[in-house]
Amino acid sequence: MKFEAVVRTEQGKGASRRLRHAGKFPAIVYGGTEAPVSIALDHDAVINQMDKPAFYEAIELVIDGAAVKVKPQDVQRHAFKPKVEHMDFIRI
């Protein structure tokens, strides 16, 4: 499973809200020897794959052209809408 991601330059609540209104959501990739990276993912592309068991085993994120193998660590969902608010990924 592969997803395209872009590095986030803006941080904070306002920037995250703008991302969500644009059909994306914020996430972070951490672990290993590299520094944590804040990214933005396309909401529809991810939400359509979340019901598959393979999603929770190994994912390949393409972050600005570099492929990174990750595993979802935490998913924050909206309280009553079927939306993802934020995700944490850990490098494998």
Curated annotation (Swiss-Prot):
It comes from the Bacteria. GO terms for molecular function: 5S rRNA binding; structural constituent of ribosome. GO terms for biological process: translation. InterPro entries: Rbsml_bL25/Gln-tRNA_synth_N, Ribosomal_bL25/Gln-tRNA_synth, Ribosomal_bL25_short, Ribosomal_L25_dom, Ribosomal_uL5_bac-type. Pfam families: Ribosomal_L25p. GO terms for cellular component: cytosolic large ribosomal subunit. The keyword RNA-binding applies. Keywords: Ribonucleoprotein, Ribosomal protein, RNA-binding, rRNA-binding. Belongs to the bacterial ribosomal protein bL25 family. Part of the 50S ribosomal subunit; part of the 5S rRNA/L5/L18/L25 subcomplex. Contacts the 5S rRNA. Binds to the 5S rRNA independently of L5 and L18. This is one of the proteins that binds to the 5S RNA in the ribosome where it forms part of the central protuberance. HAMAP family: Ribosomal_bL25 (MF_01336). This is Large ribosomal subunit protein bL25. It comes from Aliivibrio fischeri (strain ATCC 700601 / ES114). The lineage of its organism: Bacteria, Pseudomonadati, Pseudomonadota, Gammaproteobacteria, Vibrionales.
